[in-house]
Amino acid sequence: MNTRIEHIHKLGVDIGRVIISPVKDGKSDTAFLSGGIEQALQTPPAEGAIERLTRLVEVFEGRVWLVSKAGKNTQHKTRLWLAHHRFFERTGMSAHHLRFCFKRHEKAGHCVELGLTHFVDDRLDVLRHLQGLAPHLYLFGEQLKSQSAPDWVEPTLNWDETFTAICRSLD
């Protein structure tokens, strides 16, 4: 009898400031949150996000979910942005793998329900809620200099670093 248990890897990814770029033309871009729908749609994807997520969808055999904290208005803008940029078609990710919550700590419930093993977020306060739930946590993007990453997260500055770190964890 084979008693070996295969561990199925599953990835969760935040949207704002991770997939949707926080910077436009070298400046902080707040148009997605504070502007109208047309401005939000013009916000580009983060550099390398589409390409690297396309590969991660393949590596994780489709077990990739978007998990975002957003109010009703931002949820609507996010859905429109994903459609406008043909996100699901371009990455191969299932459009049914989109989850929203109203409070940051609620991402933990999605993490448990989906059995996520890896999670990428730009906020340390979110990742604190996932500590002990997903074994591989990635703090994405530039952080405040006064905020050093604890040893239970892996800081990654961009999608190239994130992709490399995630793939390394699968070896």
Provide a role label for each language-model segment.
Residues 49-82:
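Substrate-recognition element of Asp-dependent hydrolases with the DxDx(T/V) motif
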Residues 75-171:
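C-terminal cap/substrate-recognition subdomain and adjoining C-terminal extension
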